[in-house]
């Protein structure tokens, strides 16, 4: 029987529910259990695909082409599992499916209401994740905080789950904040008490508390919280601010969190305890890196940390392999000119230009890429970065001064980058991109193929609607550009490289989505190797 763990939050947002859920998932997985992660978002958008990165941060893409919350990236990187369309559900998606059923007459004329129709659809999504993955444990994170109007249907649905699948198969974990008043040097438990009271008022008694705090919580405060919340003191877990993300699962294990979860849910795991030795080595390496490598990231959304979270994480993952800390210098593409690019790139060991949409900042990206190419600075382009590298090459090497992408200039004469043929007639923006996992055949003798361990074909995740225009392929090849990765039918250009450069590779896909702390993605690994000039150092 699948076990269901629901992670909720109270007091304030951004408490680290996703990290808590991921850390627990890692511990349970390392006990030999099959774990599936799930995130419920209470916003009315169908998915985050059309949301501004400044509003939502990065849009994560799953293998099956779902545009999802960035927390799914945390799940995949920390737990090392693959997520799917069942892993991210929004209020908008729930209402859309319910209304479609109503229009088809599936409800036989019934009055469609939040209870039972919306809550039933939410429960269906939870159980569908269990059925499609055959998992031992489903960990579902509920976005927002307890008491939010938007979260009410999700809270009601998970309350009903206890009756649907049996109390012995459901566990509620509630994350709250225990603030420290610096002036009084005193921790306050009242916010936690009120948050749990709010949760209990809708019929959910938490079975475990995870307390976010700046410093360790003494036994007296834990006893007080236990008394007021009716949660046994041994199931009150501290989540202290940590210097490294990798510390969190280890801190939870030290407090016996995974064992307490297994005991509560009567789980007999294949392994008596989580084997975290490899994780400890990773944590030790991350804290004691011996070198520094500076990478300049030129992007459109650099003001928001979360906008490129998978990219910056992938850079760090590669850095661990070379025992070097990656110092990422984020530069707003709009601010770059021919006059200041040399100053911006001063002391930089490499340039990365990640994905994005729209026309803003494109000329700055092109200027940065040109500087990297002419000065043989290792360069990695991703999605839009690959497209701008192609435009730069056409302008400066092929002397096609008006070369551009039709995203920026719809009627340009030399449309090096053009909209994909099957996307021309799409009227909607949302859900109309080339999304998900696609194969790329790698050319022998290229640095790209070497980066991927001499594989013939790789599978990578995409999110774009524009592509390289094939009518320019011959001219590019004659000028020295190598198309080192193409679709198996040779129709779509997936990877370009300049073989005479130290490292100049750009991919149409998003390699950052497949990077893991203990398994850096191939292009990132080779890019940091070239930028740092260091040998690999296994750990």
From Swiss-Prot:
Q: Which GO terms describe its molecular function?
A: ATP binding; CTP synthase activity; glutaminase activity; identical protein binding; metal ion binding
Q: Which residues bind Mg(2+)?
A: 71, 141
Specify the Glutamine amidotransferase type-1 domain's residue ranges.
294-537
Q: Which residues bind UTP?
A: 13, 188-193, 224
Reaction(s) catalysed by this chain, per the record, are: UTP + L-glutamine + ATP + H2O = CTP + L-glutamate + ADP + phosphate + 2 H(+); L-glutamine + H2O = L-glutamate + NH4(+); UTP + NH4(+) + ATP = CTP + ADP + phosphate + 2 H(+)
**What is this enzyme's EC?**
6.3.4.2
Q: Where is the active site?
A: 383, 510, 512
Q: Which GO terms describe its cellular component?
A: cytosol
Q: Where is this region: Amidoligase domain?
A: 1-267
Q: What does the entry list as the binding residues for ATP?
A: 14-19, 71
Keyword Cell division belongs to the record: no
Specify the pathway: Pyrimidine metabolism; CTP biosynthesis via de novo pathway; CTP from UDP: step 2/2
- Give GO terms for biological process: 'de novo' CTP biosynthetic process; pyrimidine nucleobase biosynthetic process
- Carries keyword Ligase? yes
For this protein, the record's SUPFAM superfamilies field holds: Class I glutamine amidotransferase-like (SSF52317), P-loop containing nucleoside triphosphate hydrolases (SSF52540)
Q: For binding L-glutamine, which residues are annotated in this chain's numbering?
A: 54, 356, 384-387, 407, 465
What task does this protein carry out? Catalyzes the ATP-dependent amination of UTP to CTP with either L-glutamine or ammonia as the source of nitrogen. Regulates intracellular CTP levels through interactions with the four ribonucleotide triphosphates.
Q: Which family does it belong to?
A: Belongs to the CTP synthase family.
Q: What is this protein called?
A: CTP synthase
Native species of this protein?
Lactobacillus helveticus (strain DPC 4571)
Q: Which gene encodes it?
A: pyrG
